[in-house]
């Protein structure tokens, strides 16, 4: 294969059978359980990279069920998103995500810079309870519960919240182990079609784990819980800050 052919075909590895396809990446019946909780402000400031700013000691803990996604298939995801601001623009900084499907792990890390790791999350309805769990190996590190569809939320308002800015710290090492890419990336969810939104009483329990340290941001108080169902497109990203260029 000539170098020109390599350049024209290069998208993802392996070259002849990429781990994930080109987009657009559309999700149908994407289901969220988002539990917002109050945590320790000092710990947030220690882990959120500047120039992002933390204004409130809040964390969104998410369990996301994706039964139908373009190229990525049927999988579930769980993790923590921290409300932040970038130059006055509010958004969410994804601290870590844990999922059970290789293509979105590879694609998420390589394309956008999603901090994804392999684990075993679930989101299901158990009689009258929406139940989210995260297992890392044999260890249960997160359990979230919410009363099933106790009260409807405004669909337009929830669509606007989903459409807000999202921020990622994309890191790709060079072959010598130094940083080749170290960028702050912004992306948006697009073409959002809300199908349902509810709230109810909720609980969240986090357990310590060396490799899935969700409990490093302790739950001090539950602030809000949302159960959302939507179709949406995961938009590609843009670099808003290059750490290596500074």
UniProtKB/Swiss-Prot annotation:
SUPFAM superfamilies: Acetoacetate decarboxylase-like (SSF160104). Pfam families: ADC. The active site is at residue 116. It is an enzyme of class 4 (lyase). Keywords: Decarboxylase, Lyase, Schiff base. One of its GO terms (molecular function) is acetoacetate decarboxylase activity. Its EC number is 4.1.1.4. It catalyses: acetoacetate + H(+) = acetone + CO2. InterPro entries: Acetoacetate_decarboxylase, Acetoacetate_decarboxylase_bac, ADC_dom_sf. Catalyzes the conversion of acetoacetate to acetone and carbon dioxide. Belongs to the ADC family. HAMAP family: ADC. This is Acetoacetate decarboxylase. It comes from Burkholderia mallei (strain ATCC 23344). The gene is adc.
